[in-house]
A protein has these predicted regions:
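Active-site-adjacent betaalpha module
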Residues: 1-9, 45-53, 70, 77-201
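N-terminal nucleotide-binding beta1-loop-alpha1 segment
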Residues: 11-16
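Active-site/binding-pocket entry motifs
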Residues: 17-18, 115
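Short acidic/His/Gly/Ser-rich catalytic and metal-binding motifs that mark active-site loops
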Residues: 18-23, 67-69
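Acidic/histidine-rich helix-loop elements
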Residues: 20-36
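Short, surface-exposed alpha-helical recognition segments that flank or form part
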Residues: 34-38, 112-113
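Generic alpha-helical structural signal
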Residues: 40-44
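Short beta-strand segments at enzyme active-site cores
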Residues: 55-62, 67, 161
Length: 201
């Protein structure tokens, strides 16, 4: 695997308290696998390496107005948001978790759908000449897969950091990875770290 840092972005998906933390609204769905797969530390390594090598670091986060007037709960996942009143803009659990806090030059994209490939993300990628996207985050079979599918259809080279993603169950994760293998490159954190080299002047 080869990566050109100048044209590569690492995208961390939904690393928010309500989604990945033990006290979050989605903890009954996702927390056990986040912990057992050691996802947070692997994402942290990917992001640190991306910054050191000169890649673009992007976070996508899903959050809604305090009155939820921008929430269209047309799917079971979004109905959970509606029922739990979670992922509310301005709440601590809607923020990126402190362990993965964005650095000054990182990009944070906020959206209101399950997938995060929104016009704001497209604009950042085009402005920076990005053609390769490395995805990590939660959940593999929901937001990661949804965003990655749109990205590959848009013509980007897509790489899934398989061991830096998780879903509600190992089976759901594996089924998603098998589907994504038809559309993207499936790699490990070690593969991606090994393909990255520090930016030279």
């Amino acid at each position: 695997m080869e990566l050109n840092p100048q044209h590569t972005a690492v995208i961390a998906i939904h690393c928010q308290g309500d989604i990945v933390s033990g006290n979050g609204a989605f903890a009954p769905f996702f927390h056990d696998q986040v912990v057992s797969r050691n996802v947070i530390s692997k994402i942290d390594r990917l992001l640190d390496n991306a910054r050191e090598s000169g890649m673009t670091v992007i976070y996508t986060r899903v959050a809604f107005k305090p009155d939820f007037s921008d929430l269209n709960a047309n799917s079971p996942l979004l109905k959970v948001v509606e029922q739990a009143g979670c992922l509310k803009e301005g709440s601590e659990l809607a923020d990126i978790i402190p362990e993965l806090a964005p650095a000054t030059n990182d990009v944070v994209i906020t959206h209101q759908r399950v997938g995060g490939f929104v016009p704001e993300l497209t604009a950042v990628l085009e402005d920076r000449g990005i053609d390769t996207l490395v995805f990590a985050g939660v959940a593999t079979n929901a937001s990661v897969e949804s965003t990655a599918r749109v990205a590959t259809d848009a013509g980007y080279r897509v790489i899934i950091a398989e061991d830096a993603c998780s879903a509600a169950t190992p089976e759901a994760h594996q089924a998603s990875i098998e589907s994504l293998g038809l559309l993207a490159e499936i790699a490990t954190t070690a593969d991606i770290l090994g393909a990255s080299s520090p930016q030279t002047v």
